[in-house]
């Protein structure tokens, strides 16, 4: 047996000896010229029966292009590649398709010719693409739109930009119901209620997958993270969710059920635990509930290195019900270890066959057996005017007007305005995490350098485009200029993603520099219009009091002009809060329906020009 402690070149040689023999088995009964005869699901059992154990395990492996070459895909039969393009500044769709096709060509040269599937995290547009893709508002903003039809169109927009680069599978949508704004992934949630989860789960799946998954633009969707990750205690990412069975079923499951009913091809498990049991090791959740009770027949996928990060074993993950494992470099040791677990009887072959059946079923549904190579059909849609117009509409509809004293908004396009603040001219900040790289396009806490967001418009440039360059006085990040009567102060959070966004309740505040900036303009008698860029409500009561108008703009993405169009009256505000806005740290967590519910702004609150409203 190959030992899991083997590493590097010696390990690859050892694996190759096993695979080199096993992949040579005759397969004429299920293949024609190396391409499997899978045209319907009825063909899958014969292919499964003809596969070696090594080939089956290869299909269950997903890794990224930094960890596996196209030749590795051919030699070891790897089932999926995550297209996290290394920092090579590949800015064209053709360059990405070329990479995808290089991997696919090698997959098609395996004994059975089973295609691999290229996948990516596209959680708010094709946000990892180095070029001019459209970056959409994050889910917290989309939830504020209360417009599921728009969200379906945005998902279809994303699918077209993904397909233009050879990507056929996205790890989206996140349909967590976030119940504590301390949680660093709150911005990935549509809101604090199951009603919003259900309002947007199916439009996302419909937009990605379309009526015909084999269509040139369609991509497979992933509902995540199963289950109750938004309910983690104290908002601790990857922590434990203490929930009753009724809460689990009534609050956190319905969106997944809706996605399953619509045919979502995959579901990703949560890093977190439910009532002390890690989801990545839970047969009760992944098999008994998800597969058996809910009837999900798609692929159940781990999160990134979810087994290792969760402190679990491959045996636990396999027997819990995972079909595909997301690995980095560890695929090199995990594949022989998985084979050994089956050969020793610790994992039954039936469990492996179930996994591979689901993987082949997904690939069939994605049209990979009939159309394995990428298509340039939607290359011209990447960053197109039509796509940016739609994203700008999403920005406009996501904005929530919290305050508008004396009807100061909309502003007059003929007047001069000061624009100031850390987020006024910073596209990376307005896009947030999961943009160009994991923690965001800025220079992040890990020291990864900033990446450009090509084609994006900052908020200040959006204002300039709308009212003219001469009417905008740029005061920089923290400058003071009292020439104009009105100052648009754009401030907020620095981007973060999972693992870096959790906060103590008392720390959900603006920086001291930002607070001082707002106060300085207020004390000078300037009318302050505060635009807050954040992934959740913050404790900003004092800043609201110091502002004549206050706008929650969330994380609007690449189309900053959408903010300007509403501030200056081309469009009205229509956004509504998907989260209750706390008065103070002691109220956190606060959710609609709580006893003694008394937030600063209620769930569903949002003003239009001239009146306030509460929709739910």
Which residues does each PLM region occupy?
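C-terminal motif of bacterial Sec signal peptides marking the signal peptidase cleavage site
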Residues: 18-20
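Glycoside hydrolase catalytic-domain context in secreted enzymes
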Residues: 22-616
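Bacterial N-terminal signal peptides that target proteins for export
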Residues: 1-9
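Compositionally biased, intrinsically disordered low-complexity regions
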Residues: 8-12, 24
């Amino acid at each position: 047996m190959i030992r899991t402690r083997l590493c590097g070149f010696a390990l690859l040689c050892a694996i190759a000896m096993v695979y080199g023999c096993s992949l040579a088995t005759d397969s004429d009964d299920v293949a024609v010229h190396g391409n499997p005869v899978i045209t319907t699901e009825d063909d899958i059992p014969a292919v499964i029966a003809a596969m070696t154990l090594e080939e089956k395990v290869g299909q269950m492996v997903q890794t990224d292009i930094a960890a596996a070459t196209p030749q590795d895909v051919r030699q070891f039969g790897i089932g999926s590649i995550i297209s996290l393009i290394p920092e090579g500044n590949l800015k064209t769709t053709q360059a990405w398709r070329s990479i995808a096709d290089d991997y696919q060509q090698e997959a098609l040269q395996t004994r059975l010719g089973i295609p691999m599937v290229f996948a990516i995290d596209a959680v708010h547009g094709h946000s990892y693409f180095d070029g001019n893709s459209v970056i959409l508002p994050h889910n917290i903003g989309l939830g504020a739109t209360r417009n599921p039809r728009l969200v379906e169109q945005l998902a279809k927009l994303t699918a077209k930009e993904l397909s233009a680069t050879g990507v056929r599978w996205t790890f989206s949508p996140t349909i967590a119901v976030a119940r504590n704004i301390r949680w660093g992934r709150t911005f990935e949630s549509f809101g604090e209620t199951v009603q919003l989860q259900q309002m947007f789960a199916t439009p996302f799946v419909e937009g990605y997958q379309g009526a015909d998954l084999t269509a040139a633009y369609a991509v497979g969707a992933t509902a995540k993270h199963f289950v109750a990750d938004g309910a983690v205690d104290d908002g601790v990412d990857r922590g434990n969710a203490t929930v009753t069975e009724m809460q689990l079923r009534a609050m956190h499951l319905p969106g997944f059920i809706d996605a399953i009913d619509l045919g979502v091809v995959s579901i990703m498990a949560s890093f977190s635990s439910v009532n002390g049991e890690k989801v990545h090791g839970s047969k009760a959740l992944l098999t008994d509930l998800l597969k058996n009770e809910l009837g999900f027949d798609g692929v159940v996928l781990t999160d990134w290195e979810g087994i290792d990060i969760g402190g679990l074993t491959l045996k636990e993950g396999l027997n819990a019900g995972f079909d595909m494992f997301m690995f980095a470099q560890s695929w090199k040791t995990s594949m022989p270890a998985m084979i050994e677990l089956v050969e020793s009887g610790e994992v039954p072959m039936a469990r492996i066959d179930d996994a591979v059946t689901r993987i082949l079923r997904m690939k069939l549904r994605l049209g990979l057996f009939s159309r394995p190579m990428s298509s340039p059909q939607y290359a011209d849609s990447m960053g197109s005017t039509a796509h940016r117009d739609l994203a700008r509409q999403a920005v406009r509809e996501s904005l929530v007007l919290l305050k508008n004293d004396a009807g100061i908004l909309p502003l007059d396009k003929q007047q001069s305005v000061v624009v100031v603040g850390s987020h006024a001219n910073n596209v990376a900040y307005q896009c947030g995490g999961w943009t160009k790289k994991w923690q965001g396009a800025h220079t992040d806490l890990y020291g990864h350098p900033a990446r450009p967001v090509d084609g994006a418009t900052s908020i200040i440039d959006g204002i300039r485009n709308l009212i003219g360059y001469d009417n905008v006085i740029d005061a920089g990040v923290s400058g003071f200029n009292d020439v104009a009567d009105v100052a648009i102060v754009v401030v907020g959070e620095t981007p973060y993603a999972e693992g870096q966004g959790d906060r103590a309740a008392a720390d959900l505040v603006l920086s001291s520099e930002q607070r001082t900036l707002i106060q300085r303009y207020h004390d000078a008698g300037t009318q302050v219009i505060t635009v807050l860029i954040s992934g959740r409500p913050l404790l900003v009561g004092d800043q609201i009091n110091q502002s004549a108008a206050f706008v929650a703009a969330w994380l609007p993405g690449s189309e900053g002009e959408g903010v300007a169009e509403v501030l200056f009256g081309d469009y009205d505000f229509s956004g509504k809060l998907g989260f209750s806005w706390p008065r103070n740290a002691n109220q956190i967590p606060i959710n609609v329906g709580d006893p003694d519910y008394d937030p600063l702004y209620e769930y569903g609150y949002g003003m239009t020009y001239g009146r306030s409203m509460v929709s739910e």
